[in-house]
Structures are given as C-alpha cells and as structure tokens.
Amino acid sequence: VLHSGRPAQDFVHTIPGYQGKCAAWLDVPLQDGKEKFLKPGYERRAEAISIAKEVKRIADSCGPSLSIGVISFYRAQCDLILDALADEGLAEEEDGEIRIARSYRQTESGDERLRVGTVDAFQGKEFDVVFLSVVRANDVVVPDQKEGEERERLLNGKYGHLRLANRMNVAMSRQRKLLVAVGAKHMAEGPESEEGVPALAAFLKLCREEMAHGR
C-alpha cells in the first residue's frame, strides 16, 4: 500500500491535464516500441519522446514557478530523455554534453527547475512534478509452475531494476504535488506484477481509483 506521509493539501495544484490528481500514468503501450537492451542497461525511445513532449507542455503552461524532475532507473534512458528534451528546446549542448537549457535551469525563486537523472541523482531532492520513466516494456511471461530461484530469475529478467524496493521508494517520493509514471501500463497489471513489482502495481491501482472518483 502506498502512503505519502504528508497531508492531502500539500498536493493541491492546478497543473493542466492533472487537476486534482497526485498520481497519474501516461501509457506508452508495447506497440509503440519495446525496451532495448544496451550494456549495462536499458532504454526505450518512445517513452523518452512522450516524456519530453509532456515536460515541455507543462513547463511552458505553468512557467518558471514549477519545478520538474525526470527519473529513470537506467542511465541510458536518462541520456535519451535529454536528447528528446533537446529536440523540444529544453536542453542544449554545452561543453560536449547535453544539459538543461539555461532558460529552464532555475525557477523564479532560484531553485532547480528541471532535472533528469537516475535515482541516485534525486536522493534528498524534491520537485513539484516528477516523471518516472518505467523503461521496461516486454512480453515476457513468467509461468505459474516456475518456483523458487528460477521464478526469481525470470521476474528479474522481466522487471530488472524496477524490483529494487529501496530505489523504487526513493523514485516514488520525490514529488511535492504530482507523480506521473510513464511507460507500458501492462507491466504493472495482473498478479505477476503484484508479485514482481508490488509498488508499481499499487501505484497503477491508485491512478485508476483517482480516475474512477473523477479526480
């Protein structure tokens, strides 16, 4: 079960498209493209593009008063997201690296406005809105008859770093107002996900409950 530990009024906001919500799932279905394995990690281009477009929309709608963080469990995905943000004008090349564009680096109060990084880069930090790039998107099936170490191996193969409970906890607790998971929704559906990635499955359930209550 997911608990924020903070009062509901802390999450009140008027972010366009998410009014009244503290949790949302932006579905990027499997047919938009599977995960791609790159030693030592994974990336998914369709997710990176979706995130960049949504970050651009929200950043420009809400202006420099709103801070946004984009988290992935994979460094390769962070690099893809930065490239996609560059395509949207939110990042630029500087000293041979892609970095957040100067005009998007600070909020009007002087805080960091936009950050992209792995979970480690978000330790101890909070942003008004956080996008979590799920990355893992596959059609791997874990047969019911598989048990013990073999079952764990198959679940690890399907979900990867999403199974690291401590990192998932950090990733899901960096937002002040809104957390948006971006990825293939089916990866958080069904008994397999409840066993393999319980926090992600619970988050999708929360998103659906908010939708059902008209929030």
Q: What kind of feature is each model-predicted range?
A:
Residues 20-23, 111-112, 126-129, 175-178:
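Short glycine-/polar-rich loops that comprise or flank the Walker A/P-loop
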Residues 24-26, 117, 131, 180-182:
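Hydrophobic/aromatic beta-strand patches that form the interior of the parallel beta-sheet core
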Residues 71, 131-133, 172, 180:
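Structural motif
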Residues 75-78, 121-123, 136-140, 177, ...:
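Conserved nucleotide-binding/hydrolysis micro-motifs of P-loop NTPases
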Residues 96-130, 137:
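Conserved motor-coupling elements within RecA-like helicase/translocase cores
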Residues 142-215:
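Helicase C-terminal subdomain and adjacent C-terminal extension
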